[in-house]
Amino acid sequence: MVLSNENEILYSGECRIVSNTSGCRTREYVLEPTQDRIQRFERKQYRSIRQEIFPPPTVVFEHPLTGRLVSLNVLDLSGCGLAVEESQRSGVLMPGLMLPQLDLCLAGNVKFRCRAQVVYRRVMDCDSANSRLKCGLALLDIDVADHVQFVGLLHHASDQRSYLCNQVDMDELWSFFFETGFIYPEKYGFIHKNREQIKQTYETLYTRTPNIARHFVHQDRGRIVAHMAMIRFYDTTWLIHHHAALGNQTYRAGLNVLGQLGRFITDSHRFPFMNMEYVTCFYRPENHFPKRIFGGACQSIDDPKRCCETIFAYCRVRCDSKEDQGDLGDCRLSVAEADDLRELASFCQHDSSGLMLRALNLDPGASDQTGMIEEFRRLGLRRERSVYALKSDEQLQAILMVNLADIGLNLSDLTNCVTLFVLDHRGLTREAVHGAVVLLMKSLDQEQVPVLIYPEVAAECLKIPVEKRYVMWSLVPQFSDGFHRYTDAILRAGTKYGDSHAKRRPPSV
C-alpha cells in the first residue's frame, strides 16, 4: 500500500486487511502492517552510539496521515536516529511512515527540526496490561548547522571534555600547536612569513562554523590537550588533518579525538548535505601514531576497494629567476581531457583499485567541484583546482593536478600544491617535469610550490631530489566497519573507559 499527498509519499509497505465493510460504491478497510521493521540503510556492525540523556527530550510532530499534533518522549538518541516511546493501545507510528517535519526538543528550549522515518516498532513489556511500544526513527535530513550543534551536544554529554566545533581561543590554539611540537622549525618559518593570512583563515574556520570544516577538541579544565580537524577539500572527500595532543596526555587524549572523529563519520556520512563519500588523510610514514592507526586499519581491512594507502614522494620546486620560463623540451602541456583521465585510472588501478583517484576527484566520471568551490568563496576563502596532461609525441607521460587554496589551510601546505602522476618516466626528463611545474607556477603567480609525486619510484628514476615521503590514506565511510573494529580495539586498550560501543551510565545534559 502507498499513501501520499501532493508532494511526497508518506507511507509504503505491505499490509493485511483486518476487516472491511461491504458496499457497491464505497467501502471501508482496516489495515495492519505486516512488518515491524524496515531496512532503510545497509546493515552495519558498528552503528551510531545510542545515548540516554536527562531530562529526556521529546519529539513533536504533526501526524502526516491524521493531521493531529503528537508529542512523545525520547528513550535514546544518536547522531543519526532516535527511539521514542508510545502506548501500544494508542500507538500512531508504524514502520515505513515518513515524518516530514519533526521537532526534537531538549531542555532549555533547544530545538532541532528534522525529517525522519519510522524504521522499527517493538513491544517493550508484553505481559503488562499497559504495554508500551519502542519505535525507532532514522533521521533523513536536518539543517547543517543544527546537525553540528546536535552531534556536538551528544559528544559533550558522553564526555564533558569532548567538544565538536566549539568556539576556540585562537591564541590558545596556536600555543597548543607550538607546545605539542606540531609546528616544528621548518613549519614555523612558513607560518611566520604568512602569519596574517593564516590568522584570518583560521578565524574563519574556527569561529564561523562553516559547512566545509569540522574540528574536534579535548579539553582538560578549559585547556586544549588534543585536537583533530577535517575539511571538505574535494567535492565528496573530507581531508583529516592537524591531529596533535599535549605532553603526557598525548596517547589517551589523542585516542579520544580519534574516537570523536570515527563517531562523527558514522553519524554523518549518509546525510546528503555532508557530501562524504570518501575520507582521506596524509601522514609521514616515520610518524608512529598515524602509522599505527591509519596504516594498521588499512592492513586490517585488507580490501583496497574500501581502504587503501598510496605513497607519494615530496619535494618543493622554486622558480629561481624571471628568466626561468619552464623548458618542456619535446613535451607539450595542455588541459587534461576525459581520455587522459581514463588512461590515468587504468595506470593506477593495480595500486588502489581506483579508490585513491576517486578520493582525489580524478576519476573520469567525477563530478565538477563548482558547489564546493562556491562554499569556499562564500566564506571569503580561496579554492581552485585544475588538471593538466604532459605529453610527448601525443603519448601521455604525466598528469599534473594543481590545487590552490589559502596559505596555511593545511599547515603542511598539502592543500596548496601540485600532484604529479608519472605514467611513463622513460618518455620524461627531470628538466621537462621542472619546466611543466614552473610554467604552472608562473601562470598561477606562485614563487614556490610543494610537489607530490606518484609513484614514488618515478622521482628516483627521474633523479628528482626528494625531501620526504607522504602516505595518502583513503577510506569509504559506507564500509567503515573494519576501521571501527580496528580503532575500537586500540581505544579499549588505551583508555580506561572500555569499549566505546558498550553501554554506559546515562549522562546528564
Regions found by a protein language model. Name each.
Residues 1-227, 264-279, 286-322, 430-431, ...:
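Structured alpha-helical
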Residues 178-190, 347-361:
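Helix-loop element at the rim of GNAT/NAT acetyltransferase active sites that forms part
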Residues 206-251, 391-427:
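Conserved donor-binding loop and adjoining core beta-sheet/short helix segment
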Residues 239, 256-269:
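Aromatic (often tryptophan-rich) hydrophobic motifs at membrane interfaces
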Residues 246-259, 272-273, 424-434:
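Conserved glycine-rich acetyl-CoA-binding loop
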Residues 344:
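Hydrophobic pocket/interface hotspot
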Residues 354-374:
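Non-catalytic interaction/regulatory modules that flank or connect domains
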Residues 398-475:
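C-terminal structured domain segments
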